[in-house]
Curated annotation (Swiss-Prot):
The keyword Zinc-finger does not apply. This is Large ribosomal subunit protein bL19. One of its GO terms (molecular function) is structural constituent of ribosome. GO terms for biological process: translation. One of its GO terms (cellular component) is cytosolic large ribosomal subunit. Keywords: Ribonucleoprotein, Ribosomal protein. The lineage of its organism: Bacteria, Pseudomonadati, Pseudomonadota, Gammaproteobacteria, Cardiobacteriales. InterPro entries: Ribosomal_bL19, Ribosomal_bL19_CS, Ribosomal_bL19_sf, Translation_prot_SH3-like_sf. Belongs to the bacterial ribosomal protein bL19 family. This protein is located at the 30S-50S ribosomal subunit interface and may play a role in the structure and function of the aminoacyl-tRNA binding site. Gene3D superfamilies: 2.30.30.790. Pfam families: Ribosomal_L19.
Length: 120
């Protein structure tokens, strides 16, 4: 029975999403239904948590909107998530950045991860 479930889950897993992790600034395009219309809505913020559980994987994105912190949890393999783009790579030492909830302004900034140059 579990082999059938594994096969069905492998069919639904998305491979078109980029590699990202906590600390990265993401732009998530979400499909929104309003009556008969369907449109895309961008949600841009910092990824504060990532949960890897196969088809049940999810990630949490936090942004500040009009001075108020807004967090949204997205299912990684959901058909409602149209696309995810990484705007900026963050250099953090934690897997879960829940401490950002208590910080405001410049204290909530995250260092940018610099690319290593290949030596010639």
């Amino acid at each position: 029975m579990s082999k059938i479930i594994d096969i069905l889950e492998k069919e639904q897993i998305r491979t078109d999403l980029p590699e990202f992790g906590p600390g990265d600034t993401l732009v998530v395009q979400v499909k929104i239904r309003e009556g008969n219309n369907e449109r895309l809505q961008a949600f841009e913020g910092i990824c504060i948590a990532k949960r890897n559980r196969g088809i049940g994987s999810s990630f949490t994105v936090r942004k500040i909107s009009h001075g108020e912190g807004v967090e949204r949890v997205f299912q990684t393999h959901s058909p409602l998530v149209s696309s995810v783009t990484v705007k900026r790579r963050g250099d953090v030492r934690r897997a879960k950045l829940y401490y950002l909830r208590a910080l405001q302004g410049k204290a909530a900034r995250i260092k940018e991860k610099l690319e290593k140059k290949a030596s010639v």
